[in-house]
């Protein structure tokens, strides 16, 4: 299984603690690099986050599981993957957290754009991964970041933003809400819920 990393993210006065395995982190980076192949001149962080969100949503609707083990939080301008957001924010900090060094190898951030010199390890990308990623990239690659932000303000994002008014620590978007916003049918929602119940019971 490999080592498990304890990840603490402090965002908008909110602390989240995650335990991600080496394989999960590697998969997250691989998906990131896969998307960035379509942006040789770099991509705005906001656009990258939205493409990831829509790919995650499509994957949940089609297969009842997540594409990447990264929770999405409802930031002001749209959903953002929590772990990736924290890593990219760390680039601006001196020194960068040592635990992020491997993830950042081959990735650079300048102002609000991210660039990649590394290639994705396709051993971590399945056929179903590729289908959902390619669909999101094709559909949104040329969309203006501001328009893409508006498109990402779906019901799942709105519900999370509403929760923040009562409790700033509740800005994570649940995968069931993401699937519902993507119009997953009742059977798929029930399947996702059952998997979550089992996972929580085993954790």
Positions of PLM-derived features:
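Domain-edge interaction signal
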Residues: 2-203
């Amino acid at each position: 299984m490999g080592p498990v990393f304890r990840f603490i993210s402090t965002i908008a006065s909110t602390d989240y603690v995650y335990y991600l395995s080496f394989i999960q982190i590697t998969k997250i980076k691989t998906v990131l690099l896969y998307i960035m192949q379509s942006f040789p001149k770099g991509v705005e962080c906001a656009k990258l986050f939205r493409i990831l969100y829509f790919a995650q949503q499509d994957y949940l609707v089609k297969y009842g599981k997540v594409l990447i083990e990264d929770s999405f939080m409802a930031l002001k301008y749209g959903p953002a993957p929590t772990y990736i957001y924290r890593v990219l924010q760390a680039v601006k900090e001196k020194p960068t957290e040592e635990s992020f060094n491997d993830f950042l190898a081959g990735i650079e951030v300048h102002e609000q754009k991210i660039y990649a010199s590394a290639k994705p390890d396709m051993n971590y990308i399945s056929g179903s991964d590729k289908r959902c990623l390619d669909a999101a990239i094709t559909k949104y690659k040329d969309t203006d970041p501001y328009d893409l932000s508006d498109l990402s303000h779906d019901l799942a994002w709105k519900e999370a933003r509403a929760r923040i008014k009562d409790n700033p620590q509740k800005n994570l978007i649940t995968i069931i809400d993401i699937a519902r916003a993507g119009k997953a049918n009742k059977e798929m929602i029930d399947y996702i819920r059952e998997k979550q119940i089992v996972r929580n019971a085993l954790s």
